């Protein structure tokens, strides 16, 4: 039985912030941000908007496009690093959309989260699950503006949904996932013990989180080496040449990274689908959001070969080859 992508849907907060608005908050400029990252604006959610509610909006769009009812979904997988509930928000999403039957769980793999979630869903489809809702969602990290060591202009909130179903047609031709924990320190958001309580002579910490830390040079070197490598490995395993790929959709971290990867693959940048200019780095939502926009604009056509590739904290990376 094949794995077929039935539909996509997305939801973005209406409120957007352009680069100039950061100039009074931190020492930066529109020119510095746009020339180094490709980002011109990003979308932020007000405190009254939850990740779960935005995810539900996107889910309903995807379900409508697939002509499915929420009760016809058998599994929900939410890829996020910023859940409303640290114990998991997939169950909240299940309740929000009225999907009474599916099991629901979260996956945390940072900017590679959607790739990991999609591969995970594909394995369940091969078993007994009929229709699976795959979600990539991340929010602005509340309270970190002015403290965060990763530049604040990366922070955004975008939700994206994708519905998989069983079919004789197979959308996912191949994949490869990788992790190198030796490089973990290059991109972290670590637990920080605070407010220790003493029980006898032993201190018991109450945890909190530090700011995000990133070694930008090392993450850049990692991405521009490992992403082309894993893409070539996937394509070679399928006997598909680079020239046969119609579109590449990479994690939307930074325009310079995407340009370098295109160069190393010897493909024109015009084959790289990007939306960084309008959304910034949307973490686990970046790949599916770019995919959804390309579908809605009819850029992606039936029968085309598409490569998805994510990379991020862990350090993790991976690629999926699709036939639309």
UniProtKB/Swiss-Prot annotation:
The keyword Chloroplast applies. It comes from the Eukaryota. GO terms for cellular component: chloroplast. Disulfide bonds: none annotated. One of its GO terms (molecular function) is 3-oxoacyl-[acyl-carrier-protein] synthase activity. Pathway: Lipid metabolism; fatty acid biosynthesis. The active site is at residues 111, 251, 281. It is found in: Plastid, Chloroplast. The keyword Ion transport does not apply. Its EC number is 2.3.1.180. Gene3D superfamilies: 3.40.47.10. It catalyses: malonyl-[ACP] + acetyl-CoA + H(+) = 3-oxobutanoyl-[ACP] + CO2 + CoA. GO terms for biological process: fatty acid biosynthetic process. CDD domains: KAS_III (cd00830). InterPro entries: ACP_syn_III_C, ACP_syn_III_N, FabH, Thiolase-like. It holds the Pfam family ACP_syn_III. Residues 252-256 are annotated as: ACP-binding. Keywords: Acyltransferase, Chloroplast, Fatty acid biosynthesis, Fatty acid metabolism, Lipid biosynthesis, Lipid metabolism, Multifunctional enzyme, Plastid, Transferase. Catalyzes the condensation reaction of fatty acid synthesis by the addition to an acyl acceptor of two carbons from malonyl-ACP. Catalyzes the first condensation reaction which initiates fatty acid synthesis and may therefore play a role in governing the total rate of fatty acid production. Possesses both acetoacetyl-ACP synthase and acetyl transacylase activities. Its substrate specificity determines the biosynthesis of branched-chain and/or straight-chain of fatty acids. Homodimer. The last Arg residue of the ACP-binding site is essential for the weak association between ACP/AcpP and FabH. Belongs to the thiolase-like superfamily. FabH family. This is Beta-ketoacyl-[acyl-carrier-protein] synthase III.
């Amino acid at each position: 039985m094949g794995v077929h992508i039935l539909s996509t849907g997305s939801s973005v907060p209406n409120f957007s912030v352009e680069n100039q608005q950061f100039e009074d908050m931190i020492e930066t400029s529109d020119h510095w941000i746009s020339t180094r990252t490709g980002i011109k604006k990003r979308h932020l959610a007000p405190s009254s908007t939850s990740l779960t509610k935005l995810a539900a909006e996107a889910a309903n769009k995807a379900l409508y496009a697939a002509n499915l009812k929420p009760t016809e979904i058998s599994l929900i997988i939410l890829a996020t690093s910023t859940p409303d509930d640290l114990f998991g928000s997939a169950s909240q999403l299940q309740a929000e959309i009225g999907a009474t039957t599916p099991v629901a769980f979260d996956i945390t793999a940072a900017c590679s989260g959607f790739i990991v979630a999609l591969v995970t869903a594909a394995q369940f489809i091969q078993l007994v699950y009929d229709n699976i809702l795959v979600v990539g969602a991340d929010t602005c990290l509340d309270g970190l503006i002015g403290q965060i060591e990763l530049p604040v202009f990366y922070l955004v909130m975008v939700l994206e949904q994708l519905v998989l179903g069983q079919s004789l047609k197979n959308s996912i031709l191949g994949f490869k996932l990788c992790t190198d924990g030796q490089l973990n320190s290059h991109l972290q958001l670590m637990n920080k013990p605070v407010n220790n309580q003493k029980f006898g002579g032993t201190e018991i910490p109450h945890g909190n989180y530090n700011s995000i830390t990133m070694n930008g040079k090392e993450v850049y070197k990692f991405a521009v080496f490992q992403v082309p490598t894993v893409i070539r490995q996937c394509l070679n395993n399928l006997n598909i040449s680079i020239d046969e790929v119609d579109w590449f959709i990479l994690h939307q971290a930074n325009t310079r990274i995407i340009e370098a990867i295109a160069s190393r693959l010897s493909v024109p940048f015009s084959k790289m689908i990007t939306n960084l200019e309008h959304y910034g780095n949307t973490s686990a939502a970046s790949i599916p959001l770019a995919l959804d926009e390309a579908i809605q604009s009819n850029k992606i056509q039936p029968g085309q070969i598409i490569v998805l590739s994510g990379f991020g904290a862990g350090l993790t990376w991976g690629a999926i080859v699709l036939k639309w």
